[in-house]
């Protein structure tokens, strides 16, 4: 029997609910759910609990378990992680840490569960996989994360101090 998972509320609380082919409804994760995205066999999302605030979580519908990926910004505020993007065996996403108001590019290795800051302070948005690398927008320029060298560099569309202000990336 298969199941359909999604964020919903029955009036008493929201979370990830599953319903099987017989119509059996179960609350699998109780809490806020934002940015639900399928990554491999799991659903990744920005979830919350009273202790950690909004942090990256994952849910596996096969064994019906949910877990917090990491407490990136300790305390009840949270890292506001999002834009989860799979590249090879790594999930990349944007999240803030103790640097006030600054978002960084993070990488999470699915096989080792190692989490690292892949690009410091770049304010990444619109993470897009292109030819085995990660392209993303920053407030000033496009940036590329090279998975071979584990380094990032600007793609300088508009040379000079003004930048190009990229947005609405689309893979063709």
Please give the residue ranges for each predicted region.
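Feature 14080 marks short, conserved micro-sites in well-ordered regions
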Residues: 1-172
């Amino acid at each position: 029997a298969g199941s359909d998972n999604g964020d919903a509320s029955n009036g008493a609380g929201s979370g990830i609910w599953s319903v099987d082919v017989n119509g059996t409804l179960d609350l699998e994760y109780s809490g806020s759910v934002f940015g639900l995205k399928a990554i491999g066999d799991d659903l990744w999302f920005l979830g919350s609990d009273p202790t950690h605030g909004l942090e990256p979580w994952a849910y596996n519908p096969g064994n019906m378990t949910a877990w917090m990926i990491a407490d990136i910004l300790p305390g009840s505020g949270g890292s506001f992680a999002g834009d989860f993007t799979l590249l090879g065996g790594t999930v990349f996403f944007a999240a803030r840490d103790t640097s006030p108001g600054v978002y960084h590019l993070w990488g999470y290795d699915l096989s080792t569960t190692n989490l690292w800051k892949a690009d410091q302070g770049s304010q990444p948005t619109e993470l897009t996989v292109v030819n085995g690398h990660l392209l993303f927008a920053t407030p000033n320029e496009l940036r590329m994360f090279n998975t071979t060298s584990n380094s990032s560099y600007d793609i300088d569309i508009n040379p000079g101090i003004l930048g190009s202000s990229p947005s609405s990336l689309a893979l063709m």
